[in-house]
Amino acid sequence: MSAHASTSAAANEARGRRSAEDVEYSKTHFRVCRFITETGVKLGMRSVPMATACVLYHRFFQSASLQIYEPYLVAMSAIHLAGKVEEQHLRTRDIINVCHRYFHPDSEPLELNGKFWELRDSIVQCELLILRQLNFQVTFEHPHKYLLHYLLSVRSLLNRHAWSRTPIAETALAVLKDSYHGSVCVRHRPQHLALTALYLALQTYGVQLPRGELEWWQVVCADITKAQIETIMSELLQLYDMEAKCT
């Protein structure tokens, strides 16, 4: 085998290893964000604080390694920090007990012993680490408000019966919620993510909107292109493929 062929084979093998590692990392992040949303529901978190917790998690791991930091500890700290950022007070003890029950559904709540206080200290220290890693930039603009605006615009283009018989709003909101399971939520502008969630919901139910000189999505969001919509939509659909792999 020539030197060039050997080098090419080695490069392909390295790419294959990286690709396999990327898939495993994506699976881990998906599972951890599912953990955030499920524990968030049990803690009574509102949708925006839960979204903030997921964004904190994804932002942290944009520059941190899964091989160094325990993802579920980062997630617990992200939940704790998100409650502060979004002004929804969450007791540390409640977070610990709900998360403990997630992993040990048949066990009793942790007693206030050494194990509890050790975990509490770890959450607090990891929260400080997240703050430093993100340079204390922990307030984010979420796509929810944009989606509500776009829904009103689209609703005005449909007749009342067409709107009422298709769950466009519910589906778009569900897609938006699901987007936080992957890093798609931090790779794109919030208004672009909101519009694509609505675009996907309309496509799902085959709803056609009246056409004018511009497409409806050009009217409601002038700075997005069809290529960007397709890119984001592809990333969203990949999350649903990931869900099947993580069950």
Curated annotation (Swiss-Prot):
Source species of the chain: Danio rerio
Stated name of the protein: Cyclin-Q
Function, in words: May be an activating cyclin for the cyclin-associated kinase CDK10.
Family, similarity comment: Belongs to the cyclin family. Cyclin-like FAM58 subfamily.
Upper lineage: Eukaryota, Metazoa, Chordata, Craniata, Vertebrata
Cellular component aspect of the GO annotation: nucleus
Keyword DNA-binding: no
SMART domains to which the protein is assigned, alphabetical: CYCLIN
Keyword Transmembrane helix recorded: no
Biological processes per GO annotation: regulation of transcription by RNA polymerase II
UniProt cross-references to Gene3D superfamilies, sorted A to Z: Cyclin-like
Keywords carried by this UniProt record: Cyclin
GO molecular function per UniProt: cyclin-dependent protein serine/threonine kinase regulator activity
Pfam family, one: Cyclin_N
